[in-house]
C-alpha cells in the first residue's frame, strides 16, 4: 500500500512558484527575506490553525503573495494602510513586509478571530515589519480604527457593498480602497451601486484566473429608503 504524503511534505516551499511570483511582482532582497520568514511561519501554524486553503499551499507565492504585492503598483506612494479581515495575512502581512523599507510605512490589520490575530502579531514580530493587529469585527468598530489612511484593502472578506460601507468613514481626500475580488465582480458592482455612488476602476489581476481589483477613491451614499440604508451597513 502506498504511504500517505505527510502534511509537512505538502507544505514545502515550491521554488518555481516563488520565482514565478517574483517575476510578476519584483521586490527587494530584504523584502524577499521577510516574505520567506512569513511563509515559513505560516506553514508551521497551518497545522493547528487553518490560515489558507490547504489546496493552495504549493502555490503560496503565486496564489497569495503575488496577488497581494500587486496592490503596491496601484498605490505606490501609500504608506499608511488598513487591511480588513486579514486572516492569514493576505494582503496585510505581505504589505507590511514591503512597508518595512519605507519611512512612515505602517499596516493596521483588522481580524476578529483571536487565533488568527495571534498569528498576525507573531508574523509582524518575526519579519520585523511595521504594523498593528486589532482584534475587532470590521462592522462594529470603525470608530476605533486609525485615521489619515492612504489605502484600505480587503480580500475574500465580505460583499463589495458592505466593504464600501466599512471603508467610507475612513477615507479622506487622496485616499483609496483596493478590494481583491473574483469572477462575480460585475454582479457585486451592480449591487454596490444600489447603495453607493462610486466611480470604480477595475484592474485584471496580474496572477490571472478570474481575479480582479476594484479601485475606489470616492464614495457617496445613494438616496435610499431607510430599509435599504440599513441593508447597506
UniProtKB/Swiss-Prot annotation:
Its main location: cytoplasm. It is an enzyme of class 2 (transferase). Keywords: Cytoplasm, Methyltransferase, rRNA processing, S-adenosyl-L-methionine, Transferase. It is found in: Cytoplasm. NCBIfam families: rsmG_gidB. Specifically methylates the N7 position of guanine in position 527 of 16S rRNA. PANTHER family: S-ADENOSYL-L-METHIONINE-DEPENDENT METHYLTRANSFERASES SUPERFAMILY PROTEIN (PTHR31760:SF0). This is Ribosomal RNA small subunit methyltransferase G. The gene is rsmG.
Amino acid at each position: 500500500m502506498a504511504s500517505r504524503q505527510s502534511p509537512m511534505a505538502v507544505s514545502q516551499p515550491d521554488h518555481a512558484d516563488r520565482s514565478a511570483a517574483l517575476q510578476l511582482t519584483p521586490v527587494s532582497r530584504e523584502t524577499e527575506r521577510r516574505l520567506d520568514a512569513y511563509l515559513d511561519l505560516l506553514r508551521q501554524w497551518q497545522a493547528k490553525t487553518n490560515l489558507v486553503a490547504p489546496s493552495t499551499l504549493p502555490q503560496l507565492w503565486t496564489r497569495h503573495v503575488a496577488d497581494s504585492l500587486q496592490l503596491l503598483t496601484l498605490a505606490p506612494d501609500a504608506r499608511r494602510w488598513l487591511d480588513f479581515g486579514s486572516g492569514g495575512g493576505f494582503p496585510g502581512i505581505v504589505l507590511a513586509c514591503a512597508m518595512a523599507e519605507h519611512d512612515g510605512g505602517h499596516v493596521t490589520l483588522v481580524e476578529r478571530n483571536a487565533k488568527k490575530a495571534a498569528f498576525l502579531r507573531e508574523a509582524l514580530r518575526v519579519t520585523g515589519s511595521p504594523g498593528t493587529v486589532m482584534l475587532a469585527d470590521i462592522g462594529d468598530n470603525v470608530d476605533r480604527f486609525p485615521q489619515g489612511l492612504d489605502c484600505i484593502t480587503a480580500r475574500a472578506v465580505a460583499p463589495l457593498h458592505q466593504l464600501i460601507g466599512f471603508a467610507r468613514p475612513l477615507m479622506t481626500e487622496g485616499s483609496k480602497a483596493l478590494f481583491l475580488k473574483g469572477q462575480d465582480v460585475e454582479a457585486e458592482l451592480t449591487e454596490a451601486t444600489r447603495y453607493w455612488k462610486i466611480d470604480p476602476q477595475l484592474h485584471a489581476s496580474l496572477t490571472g484566473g478570474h481575479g480582479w481589483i476594484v479601485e475606489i477613491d470616492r464614495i457617496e451614499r445613494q438616496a435610499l429608503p431607510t430599509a435599504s440604508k440599513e441593508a447597506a451597513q
